[in-house]
């Protein structure tokens, strides 16, 4: 069978074609598979769509019952998993859902939820038994056109976990167009003319996708080519639900809890469908359950009218804007609900205008897709908008059953692709891909339009790879650059709209020696499943090294605004490296003299050393690691300068490998453990590197620190040097990846001790780091519960000089799960009112280099690039 699966944000569906049923081989009949699912307690029915919801109850029901039960107990409902797959601010493989349930209630990862939805459909198909196991069929699984490579790979991983290892990915707008071809082409071909441009406007529950397809016609011969794809927009029907929920909460006149808001949102989603689809329905009543012992008696009531829903939908999301009006660049989205980073401007009109201007094409026709456009009034509004912009009304290509169009189109594509019958849309890869060179340039790896199976090679004389150590590449992509060719070096203009992906990394093993340069060719291929495969081929051997995405790491988004990096000549760097060798290899320079001598030869104070120079020094310190054992003084200097040059452990190519090298000395401890200063510098060293370590590595450090900081009941606190204790606390507080419960215990223990001994700057820094609403490097799913931060704010209410701590503990993120309650925020605001910190507290300004340095505990290297 030729199967299409729509893994939707709100609803999923499965359709198939039996080639043996095709009387007309170009347009075979498409069947929709009805999916059995629980619709009420003890009742199972088959439905044409599977709501993309999982309810965390016995058996973890999926679908209609899960969605409806979630409206009653929203903190046990998992939804919008597809939106989370594209959210690089979190670890998408970690158990972070449901987001609003808090750490103890988060039991599934976005990948696991997606796998469960797919496996539910697979189990239903297999149990039906008519056509053999689903895993043996020709399957096409759809993804948003704007999904980047990381999100696509995670989608494939989810399918593999669900038992579907063999499949192809197809972009949802293309699937919608294939559905139109399958169901309408024969009778609508008269509408098609040569040069015609069709806009596919696909707005679902969580994402908006725009694509353009151009028609080529020569008599009866008609071809379609995709010519443009819009960038990823986390904006859809969910945002309208949130807007209606905001309106209802305003009318209720009471601030609701997270649980109440989740239930309200589900009611508003149902109200939206009723009010926008049925003009006879003038209002819908909204009921919000009370909290605590007065769940029923304390319930709240209001209503949403059709007029209100229309005004918000039409004027808020589809306003009749001027053609040249661009999306508004707000500091953060007004609709950042439940952790998802929705776009700041909800006006789909402005995003569509920006896309069409970038594409440089005027649509002659529109094909709508996605649940957002089920109400006819919203489809009409987009047609009005295009007529308003271009002076002509576009032809409307109708797709029946918008909830099923993607699945049926995917099934048609599976059929056409595997049988050679039917019609295929050309267009290939929607992005051009580049390997970054320096800060502002790159070499084109794969051009936009590369077709499935195409192999591209970049063979340049100047391409060499460092062997016998891990290497990392910056991978960039563009949706708008159309003329670049493989191997071309491009200097990107300032403001170029580039997407920076998670880095590509590989371990290059070559020969038995140490580091060496190997001449290579770069290769890439758009695989049959629709993902990008990249590799390096040696020119002097048969070796091939695959480059893999580091999906657990956040991709770098924007450089931190701050000091420009100084430029230091290679001769000066070489002189600085020779000073280090003179000190550690030859003993010609006393270790305590080395910092001043380095500053003198570099002509810069050490806080101004650029990151590239610092990392070259760090590499030499790591090479000379055994030389630290010459004396206690040498170890102190090695730890102090080595850690300083490697701080903060990430943000520069090769840092992961440097951390692995540094970790080799951890288990043995300091070489001169009986010296207090060596122990102090030992913990400073690991605190500086903490951001580059993974969860397990940080756990090793915590395991060694915690007995000294929080002894088990019945054991006395070990007496130690105050400076050593202070640095141990700072290092423990820098471990953002250890369990939240452990970090809560650390903060509580520190506050308890400080109430007896006093609140010094180190205590305040540790508390601010542990309870930060926006972590220095950790993903958003590692932020401590807002109730904990609120409790710590109250504990600091009467303590002087807490402005920085208050900003960290109470900074607004726009995510109600992370933001502290109003009372705690008011305490923090009262401490910073009238100071420059108020903008940071309100979340109105991005964290600049100074703010990040304050969070880290010291200045960061100039030129360092961190995630925004």
Which functions belong to the PLM regions below?
Residues 169-201, 405-424:
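Conserved phosphate-binding catalytic cores of ATP/NTP-utilizing and phosphoryl-transfer enzymes
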Residues 139-154, 292-293, 340-345, 362-385, ...:
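Glycine-rich phosphate-binding loops at beta-strand->alpha-helix junctions
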Residues 116-131, 179-191, 315-363, 381, ...:
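Phosphate/ATP-binding catalytic cores across multiple sugar-kinase/actin-like superfamilies
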Residues 165, 288-359, 421-638, 642-653, ...:
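Acidic low-complexity intrinsically disordered segments
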Residues 27-162, 171, 239-285, 289-330, ...:
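Phosphate-binding loop and its immediate beta->loop->alpha context
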Residues 1-95, 168-171, 175, 219-226, ...:
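Early-domain small/polar-rich strand-loop-helix modules and first-structured segments
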Residues 1-25, 185-226, 377, 516-541:
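Gly/Thr-rich phosphate-binding beta-strand-loop-beta motif of the actin/hexokinase/Hsp70
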């Amino acid at each position: 069978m030729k199967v299409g699966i729509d893994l939707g944000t709100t609803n999923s569906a499965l359709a198939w074609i039996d080639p043996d049923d095709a009387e007309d081989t170009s347009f075979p009949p498409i069947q929709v598979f009805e999916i059995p699912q629980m619709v009420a307690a003890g009742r199972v029915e088959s439905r044409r769509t599977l709501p993309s919801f999982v309810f965390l109850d016995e058996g973890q029901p999926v679908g209609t019952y899960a969605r409806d039960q979630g409206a009653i107990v929203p903190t046990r409902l998992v939804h919008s998993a597809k939106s989370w797959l594209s959210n690089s601010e979190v670890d998408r493989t970690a158990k972070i859902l449901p987001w609003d349930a808090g750490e103890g209630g988060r039991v599934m990862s976005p990948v696991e939820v997606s796998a469960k939805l797919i496996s539910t459909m697979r189990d239903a198909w297999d149990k039906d038994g008519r056509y053999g196991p689903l895993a043996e069929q020709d399957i096409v699984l759809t993804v948003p056109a704007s999904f980047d490579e990381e999100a696509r790979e995670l989608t494939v991983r989810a399918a593999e976990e669900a038992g579907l290892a063999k499949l192809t990915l197809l972009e949802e707008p293309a699937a919608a167009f294939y559905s139109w071809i399958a169901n309408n082409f024969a009778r609508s071909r008269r509408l098609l003319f040569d040069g015609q441009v069709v806009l596919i406007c696909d707005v679902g529950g969580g994402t908006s996708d725009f694509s353009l397809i151009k028609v080529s016609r020569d008599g009866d011969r008609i071809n379609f080519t995709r010519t443009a794809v819009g960038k990823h927009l986390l904006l859809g029907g969910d945002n309208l639900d949130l807007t209606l929920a905001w309106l209802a909460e305003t009318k209720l006149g009471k601030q609701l809890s997270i649980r109440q808001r989740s239930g309200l949102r589900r009611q508003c989603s149902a109200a939206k469908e009723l009010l926008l689809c049925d003009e006879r329905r003038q209002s819908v009543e909204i009921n919000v359950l009370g909290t605590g012992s007065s769940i029923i008696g304390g319930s709240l009531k209001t209503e949403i009218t059709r007029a209100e829903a229309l005004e918000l939908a039409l004027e808020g999301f589809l306003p009749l804007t001027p053609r040249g009006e661009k999306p508004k660049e707000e500091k953060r989205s007004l609709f950042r609900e439940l952790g998802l980073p929705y776009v700041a401007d909800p006006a789909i009109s402005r995003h569509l205008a920006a896309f069409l201007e970038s594409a440089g094409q005027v649509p002659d026709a529109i094909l709508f897709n996605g649940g957002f456009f089920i109400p006819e009034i919203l489809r009409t509004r987009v047609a009005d908008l295009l007529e308003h912009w271009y002076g002509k009304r576009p032809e409307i290509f109708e797709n029946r059953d918008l909830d099923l169009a993607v699945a049926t189109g995917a099934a048609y594509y599976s059929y056409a692709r595997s049988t050679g019958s039917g019609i295929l849309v050309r267009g290939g890869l929607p992005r051009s891909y580049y390997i970054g060179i320096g800060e502002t340039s790159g070499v084109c790896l794969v051009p936009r339009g590369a077709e499935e199976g195409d192999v591209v090679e970049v063979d340049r004389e100047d391409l060499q790879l460092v062997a016998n150590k891990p290497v990392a590449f910056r991978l960039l992509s563009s949706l708008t650059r159309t003329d670049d060719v493989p191997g071309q070096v491009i200097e990107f203009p300032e403001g170029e709209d580039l997407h920076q992906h998670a880095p590509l990394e590989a371990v290059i093993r070559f020969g038995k020696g140490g580091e060496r340069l190997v001449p290579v060719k770069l290769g890439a291929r758009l695989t049959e499943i629709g993902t990008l495969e990249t590799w390096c081929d040696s020119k002097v051997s048969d070796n091939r090294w695959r480059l893999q995405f580091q999906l657990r790491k956040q991709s770098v988004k924007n450089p931190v605004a701050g000091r420009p990096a100084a430029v230091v000549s290679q001769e000066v760097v070489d002189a600085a490296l020779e000073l280090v060798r003179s000190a550690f290899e030859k003993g010609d320079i006393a270790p305590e003299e080395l910092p001043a001598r380095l500053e003198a030869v570099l002509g810069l104070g050490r806080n101004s050393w650029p990151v590239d120079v610092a990392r070259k020094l760090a590499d030499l310190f790591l090479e000379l690691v055994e030389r630290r054992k010459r004396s206690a003084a040498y170890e102190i200097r090695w730890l102090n300068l080595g850690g300083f040059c490697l701080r903060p452990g990430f943000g520069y190519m090769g840092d992961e490998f440097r951390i692995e090298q540094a970790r080799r000395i951890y288990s043995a401890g300091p070489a001169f453990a009986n010296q207090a200063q060596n122990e102090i510098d030992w913990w400073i060293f690991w605190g500086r590197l903490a951001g580059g370590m993974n969860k397990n590595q940080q756990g090793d450090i915590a395991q060694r620190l915690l007995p000294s900081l929080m002894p088990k009941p019945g054991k006395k606190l070990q007496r130690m040097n105050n400076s050593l204790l202070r640095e141990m606390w700072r290092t423990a507080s820098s471990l953002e990846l250890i369990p939240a419960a452990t970090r809560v215990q650390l903060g509580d223990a520190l506050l308890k001790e400080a109430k007896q001994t006093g609140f010094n700057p180190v205590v305040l820094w540790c508390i601010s780091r542990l309870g930060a609403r926006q972590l220095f490097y950790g993903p958003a799913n590692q932020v401590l519960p807002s109730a904990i931060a609120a409790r710590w704010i109250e504990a600091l209410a009467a303590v002087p000089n807490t402005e920085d701590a208050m900003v960290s503990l109470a900074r607004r993120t726009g995510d109600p799960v992370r933001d502290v309650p109003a009372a705690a925020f008011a305490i923090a605001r009262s401490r910073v009112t009238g100071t420059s910190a108020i903008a940071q507290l309100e979340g109105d300004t991005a964290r600049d280099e100074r703010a990040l340095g304050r969070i880290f505990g010291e200045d960061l290297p100039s030129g360092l690039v961190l995630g925004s």
